[in-house]
Amino acid sequence: MHFAFGCLHVPVADGCEVQVSMADDQPAWVTVVRGDSGLQLQAFAAPKRDGLWAEVRQEIAAEVAKAGGQSEEADGPFGVEVHARIAPPEPVPGMPGGLHPVRFLGVDGPRWFLRGVISGPAALRPEIAAPLEQVFADVVVVRGDHPVPPRDMLEIRLPAEALQALADEAEAQEENRWGGLEPFQRGPEITETR
């Protein structure tokens, strides 16, 4: 069974939680969380003839170095990947300060490119990474037939159940907004006498 997030169909894995991160009120990436580790997923349009992963690896290495981190290429279960140590944009609860390990995975498909980022203990320990690697291997990218410029992110959409849950949550927040007060009902009055 897979959860359909538009272009990404993400498998349901035991012990994993699936989260969708938003940017500018739009779904930006899907993260599969297992324990203290995570796998961030994004799919991009790619040219018909060439893949993107070789170029993207070089760009990742340059960005990591520019941010004061370290990176190196290594062979992994999906081919060449980038092992990096980066400073998180903000402190991570329960993690020591300094550079944190991450693994960048990439797969070129027909007119699409799938990028995965493994973080947390799974970035260093293969036995912890194995379930997340299996999720990455089982992701289905639905490119669609419409034209999308190379390197543009393919559209991630929330499943209908998630949209309904968000609508229900927004409605509950609106109902609780006044904390039990009726905004159009007269409240306590104070009279000043001089």
For every predicted segment, state its role.
Residues 1-5, 11-100, 112-114, 160-164, ...:
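Conserved polar/disulfide-associated segments of primarily extracytoplasmic proteins
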Residues 49, 71-76, 117-121, 145-151, ...:
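Short C-terminal domain-edge/linker segments immediately following a structured domain
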Residues 64-66, 137-139, 150, 172-173:
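Short, intrinsically disordered/low-complexity patches at protein termini
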Residues 81, 148-184:
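Short, highly charged C-terminal tails/helix-capping segments
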Residues 101-106:
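Hydrophobic/aromatic beta-strand elements that line small-molecule binding cavities or substrate pockets
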Residues 117-163:
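Surface-exposed amphipathic alpha-helical segments
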